[in-house]
């Protein structure tokens, strides 16, 4: 459950990014990490907006991409669990959509990656 002292940023993407950074994770915006993966890190990506049923609400979708170095695949599951446990603190602002991609080896950064999906429900303006 979200802490009543939570410091809101200007956007929900910034909230997610800063929360993870303040938790001690190495966090990047998409396409900003340069070089090979040497230690676990996260990339926070905005995945677009979808309408919420027939209500005057929408869902902003976000991916939290979890990376571990090529030779540390065995640490991927624990890293994902830790990230999900941390993000549970942001409910109901962000809800896990129960979507988690299979692991993917990203040769461009020499890392294994799994994406976990989160949603932010909001009233249309």
Model region roles, listed by residue range:
Residues 35-39, 106-109:
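Beta-rich nucleic-acid/ligand-interaction surfaces
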């Amino acid at each position: 459950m979200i802490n009543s002292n939570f410091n809101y940023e200007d956007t929900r993407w910034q909230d997610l990014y800063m929360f993870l950074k303040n938790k001690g994770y190495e966090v990047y915006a998409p396409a900003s990490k340069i070089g090979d993966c040497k230690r676990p890190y996260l990339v926070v990506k905005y995945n677009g907006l979808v309408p919420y049923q027939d209500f005057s609400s929408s869902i902003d979708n976000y991916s939290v991409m979890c990376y571990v170095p090529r030779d540390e695949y065995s640490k991927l599951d624990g890293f994902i669990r830790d990230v999900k446990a941390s993000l549970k603190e942001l409910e109901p602002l962000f809800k896990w959509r129960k979507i988690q991609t299979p692991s993917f080896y990203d040769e461009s950064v020499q890392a294994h990656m799994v994406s976990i999906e989160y949603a932010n429900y909001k009233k249309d303006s």
